[in-house]
Design a protein with these regions (language model features):
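Catalytic core of pol beta-like nucleotidyltransferases
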Residues: 1-21, 29-35, 48-140
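Short hydrophobic/aromatic beta-strand micro-patches
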Residues: 42-46
Length: 140
């Protein structure tokens, strides 16, 4: 982890000392960033703290991160984003910090299980859409 990312992790931990994990995702995680790229970070918090914290995109923490990085920073509360987004972050992101390996592994396992279940549930819907090219009033 480079010095810039280490500093950003420290800012997140200053505001959320109980953070269980922090992931870098998006263009920076893929090594495809350019001059106008934002930095995408996801923080895994204990369940009760995640609920209390809510959406972090416009939080004081996100603003402090953006000020430090001198670019936009998208900070997401990993427990509160969609199942599809959780799966994307887990599978394409880079783990920058982990203080609770069992909690991280449990979250990743549950998120993957939820994603698999969602994929199974929507498989028939997707097949019907591909067959008819209609999103509504499609009989199976």
């Amino acid at each position: 982890m480079n010095a810039e990312m280490r500093t950003l992790v420290e800012i997140v931990l200053r505001d959320f000392p109980s953070a269980q994990a922090i992931y870098l995702f998006g263009s920076y995680a893929r090594g495809e960033q350019h001059t106008r790229s934002d930095i995408d970070l996801a923080v895994l918090l204990p369940v009760d703290i995640a609920r209390a914290a809510g959406d972090l995109r416009l939080s004081d923490t996100a603003l402090a991160l953006a000020k430090q990085a001198r670019r936009d920073v998208d900070l997401v509360n990993l427990r509160l984003v969609s199942t599809v987004f959780q799966n994307e972050i887990i599978h394409t992101g880079v783990l920058l910090y982990c203080s609770d390996e069992p909690a991280r592994q449990e979250f990743e396992m549950l998120a993957l299980s939820a994603y698999i279940k969602l994929s199974e549930e929507r498989a028939d819907i997707l097949r019907a859409f591909l067959r008819t090219r209609q999103a509504y009033n499609v009989s199976q």
